[in-house]
Amino acid sequence: MASSRAQRFNPIAFTPWPVTCITTIVYLALLIPILVINLVVPSAPETNPKGVNLTEAWRDLQHLTGGFHPYNSRRNDEVHEWLLSRINSIIRPTVEAGQRSSATDNLPEVFVFDDNRSNLTYSNGGVGKTSIVGVYFESTNIIVYIRGSEDDSENWRERSNGKPKGKGGVLVNAHYDSVSTGYGATDDGIGVVSLLQLLRYFTTPGNNPRKGLVLLFNNGEEDYLNGAHVFSQHPLSNFTHTFLNLEDTEVTRFYGNTKHPFGSVLAADGFKMGLLRSQTDYVVFNGILGLRGLDLAFIAPRSRYHTDQDDTRHTSIDSLWHMLSASIGTTEGLVSYTGMDFDGKSKGQNKVNSGAGSLGVWFDMFGTAFAVFRLHTLFAISVALLVIAPLVIFITSVILSKTDRMYLFSMSKSLEGTGDQVSLRGLRGFSRTPIILVIATTIPICLAYLLEKVNPYIVHSSQFSVWSMMFSAWIFLAWFLACAADFFRPSALHRAYSYTWIFVATWIMLVINTVYANQKGIAAGYFLLFYFAGAFLATWISYLELFALPRKGDFARQTTGRRPSSLSSRLLTSSADELRSNASPSTAEFPGAAGEDTDPTESTSLLRGQRTTFANYRTSGPGGAAEETDEREDINKGGTFEHEQSWSWTLPRWTWVLQLLLLAPIVLILVGQLALFLTASMCQVGSDGVSTFVVYLACAVFTTLLCIPLFPLIHRFTYHIPTFLFLVFIGTLIYNLVAFPFSPANRLKTFFIQEVDLDNGSSTVSLTGIQPYLTEAINSIPSAAGQNITCDKTTPFGMLERCSWSGLSPNVLGQGRERDTEIVPDKWITYNITKTVGKNKARIEISGRNTRACKLKFDRAVANFQVSGSAVDHRMPPTSRQGPGVIPALDEVRLYAPSWIAISKAADGLVEASHSFTIQ
């Protein structure tokens, strides 16, 4: 007996063990590499590539991040001088080679501009809820121009309003200022040292650029993107047509040249829809100047962004190489391109003629390949598939009906001649899919709501615990309900109906996504096209399987000819008339005892046709159990699984593997990477005042999208994996509800500001953050002990609170070891106000000590203003930002705050002194 069963064993049959093992292997084989790609940075090469020196780049990064260097600091000036020195040391061999033999053209010409002449007055609305402000800024940018072999040889840069001839150049940008609370390793130290290595690379023999390359070391990005704004006043801003920033397909395709591409259009659409509140220089280069480009940036961990952990200890040479290699690959593609895509007429007025461009779709595949195509292509393919796929399913259904093999939606078959009805039970399993999917999807959403109410910030440090909880809950519940439905109402059509429902649902989602892509230019739902394509093919296979079934008429005649009418069999069904004539009195009184011999529907009792004794053993009707058992075993030998419809024995037993491979891999690769990308970039946004429910809801939605390919097969799973996942769910649920959400590795970010009122000499320190953790942090600060801490929610940070107390006096006036904490107006600021007689105008002269940043606030809005000697650009109208020991209050907060607290800046400066004035 055992050997007979072994011979019949099929390793890919649609039976519990093959389904459980193969499905598990497929999911693990795809999910594990996706996790590795998202969590592990590609290793740097052991030997330096030609034109690159990684050891030198790492030393440069360590020097650059040796201290905080915001724009308004002396350390910033030191960094500026150091950069000039490094640039000159790199290009010195190039200059010397040019002096030896200017005719050889072995090395390109390099020009360095220390731009301390450009200035600009403009307005900036800031980010989020910040008010509109007028800004005056003086440039300290460093600009390096590497002449391309095809560039205009004339010295147009020295002429007033000079413009180059020929094709536009390429701009690569990074800012060398940091925030006042961070060392700036990833924001943007790695970018700066990458520019230095790009300079070395393109001045190495054999790497000469065909197009001109402009390397912009801009200063002042952290406050209103000032460095990028003032670059618009330099002649080289008219020369460049492209830069590094994700926007359109023509530029993005060059990013595919890199060895380890990583990214998705989802991030760009997040900025476009306002979901991400921060901004980069992209809004200036593209939105104002009209350049087209690509952005390379770090997205995680956000808890270290703009804090003192943004240093070389918390990054690596591998991360440096990842950005540097991507920069080299993309830039090399741009400077070598000879087409005219970036030299046509621009869409906007007063912008660089960089061509119109087109919206694009892009995503990486396992960090090794990069797909790029136009949004219009996505729209066209989506529309075609939305029409063709339903048409193919419809035509296949018609052919099945014509050949009398359409068992789907068929409740019974009439016998020719007699008119008797033979039950087919083809409608069984139709409605279970949407019901179970709705319930299984509701559970993660309920869990999201539960976490938001009980422990809303657990995702800050434990995103994979949240993922595990939702995945395990979804799979276990779907398995339990599907197995229960299959036990009471087994159906060979469960898989076909499941894929049909998935087909319908993804068709609707693709329609919505196609409309958004066409009307709003949103491409983040690109994965739905591939999701729907996989669902369509899997569904079509289920319909094609039906051609292997006997004709319904043949099955009906065979059924009535094999056995007398009785109630003994659950598998072979007699007509209703025969049932009534052969039924015993006891069964005639109870219609439910007739089992499945009447026409069933999805609303019929789940216990029909399968009566149990008090010991829960199944019994049969008149005719005896022996007859039923012999008949069932005979049918099962032919291929019918347990108590499924007897006509299903001819269905192929291997096609489920093909369906799994058509749907699951593409979903896991595209949706899985999006899910991890989304949570990595958003899991810590709670500290910025964003509701974490959005993150949990996204996890719930992506959990459903990732698990749906399992559902048509999940009723065949053995109990082992679902039971294990149930235990995982219990453990992760308890952890997520009770665990402390922050840790030294995943700190809660708070925002510091100290305000000095020169009128009354008061000094107020404020921290903005999440309650109740903010109060706990403040209670650990000595100077706040015993004080009346005032808190309010009137902040530009959304859901955060701002708490204030009287803090230690700052020492921002002193230089070196000199201390000067006296709050006297004349020591901090001098000013003179002259009002124009007879006009609503005034002249204000102001000078602050030991600072080059100044802010004027008015009680009423100012119609217009002008800074003496400032340039004005009609593209940016003027109406419509120190080290330890200087600010003792900040040092105190850093010293005594819990280890799970991080400090970041709350405003343009860390200390803001105010003095009231009156214009008379």
UniProtKB/Swiss-Prot annotation:
SUPFAM superfamilies: Zn-dependent exopeptidases (SSF53187). Its cofactor is Zn(2+). Keywords: Glycoprotein, Hydrolase, Membrane, Metal-binding, Metalloprotease, Protease, Transmembrane, Transmembrane helix, Vacuole, Zinc. The record marks Y305 as: Transition state stabilizer. Zn(2+) 1 binds at H175, D187, E247. The active site is at E221. It comes from Ajellomyces capsulatus (strain H143). Residues 559-575 have a biased composition (Low complexity). The chain crosses the membrane at residues 21-41, 379-399, 434-454, 464-484, 496-516, 521-541, 660-680, 694-714, 721-741. This is Vacuolar membrane protease. InterPro entries: Fxna-like_M28_dom, M28_fam, Peptidase_M28, PFF1_C, PFF1_TM. Glycans are attached at N53, N116, N119, N238, N760, N788, N832. It is found in: Vacuole membrane. Zn(2+) 2 binds at D187, E222, H306.
